[in-house]
């Protein structure tokens, strides 16, 4: 914490001096904890749920009430709604099936089998019979069966399961039997039930909407069809309702999603639950995508179907696929990849890859960590010294109860060179999925690489790590290791950089996997000609 009174006193005496000197009180984060290796943490919504919420709000703004329609629909309702067309429609429905409950008796043979497992049945026979009978009658749930058998025989649940497997094989041989109940394949099957019940409960006209899941037995799933999808559907019931209401609702709803201009084209399908010549496809123009898109269907329910549900006023229904709208809004090409991204390839952005490039070794001790900055500054300042030359830094550290005198000598003995090589100030960038070392200046860079490197510097994501930075951390990290191991001297020599590890850098496996799979590159090659000798006394 700051010593506020001292700072104020210093500022009162000499504000400029206090302003400059107090900057050291703001400690910089360590390299692996600095930007871009730190990222803001936030959650992420799903595009389908985003679209559902946007549709909900759009319907509510238009004065609709939200309802949840039944998901499980008896096939009789499909016949009532579709008439003779029902058989063809039911082909796309999923039927619900369940396992039958076998009539399992407790014969002498089964009692003998149980007793062979070392369990006395005589005292518990009646209790066991009651449990089996209760299961058959449906008064006992299947997931409680093992527990109840175990309790009745006063045995462990593991032994109860063994009895079920070995003595009562009837349970293993069960085959599901289909019922007459179906999973809703479209929202209409639910609207007839809902509107029918509300006819004597709500004053006419009324406007309802529901956004929920439907199930359709597609022959196969592809880039535009799934076996389960969300329908955003509405129904308006009242005298005078006709297809003009459908047109107005379509425009009012879809204009809230950026669509302009609408075409209403008669649907060739002519479903029997709609009044003839009312089933209509809605095409809308999206100025961003610059194309006309089919986005919804509406129609007026047939008086024949309505009458079977006790409904004696017109009902207009409009529906659209949520996933379809989400694909348009998010510019997705494949509904499967949009809905289930976890099962498809995930592409990391350059920003994300940059956050995964880190120093491999970093000293833990603050004093040694702070030495790194001094070492970096000295190297940058003296990098162009003409050889033979050397740069020496001496420091004394307290390590436990001992003093460590450290002498770091950076040198170049060969004549006609600089203290450090030309790539020493290269910085690591991530550009178009590639991890590359980009020089401070493009003087002397071959023309075949120049354009790519210039674009990388202008458009890529800088990691903020130069070769000299990472290498100096390598030196100070080895110095710390030498303190711990009581080593008195060591050398660091890096002539040519060929890989990240040569400059004390590492990259997360996730990023590395993407780079390899996308045939991208990690290219950090360059001459640094670093020669270091460190002595500790």
UniProtKB/Swiss-Prot annotation:
The keyword Nucleotide-binding applies. InterPro entries: aa-tRNA-synth_II (IPR006195), aa-tRNA-synth_II/BPL/LPL (IPR045864), O-Pseryl-tRNA(Cys)_ligase (IPR005246), Phenylalanyl-tRNA_Synthase (IPR002319), SepRS_C (IPR041590). Its EC number is 6.1.1.27. It catalyses: tRNA(Cys) + O-phospho-L-serine + ATP = O-phospho-L-seryl-tRNA(Cys) + AMP + diphosphate. This is O-phosphoserine--tRNA(Cys) ligase. The keyword Protein biosynthesis applies. Substrate binds at residues 186-188, 231-233, 273-274, 317. It is an enzyme of class 6 (ligase). It comes from Methanococcus maripaludis (strain C5 / ATCC BAA-1333). Homotetramer. Interacts with SepCysS. One of its GO terms (biological process) is tRNA aminoacylation.
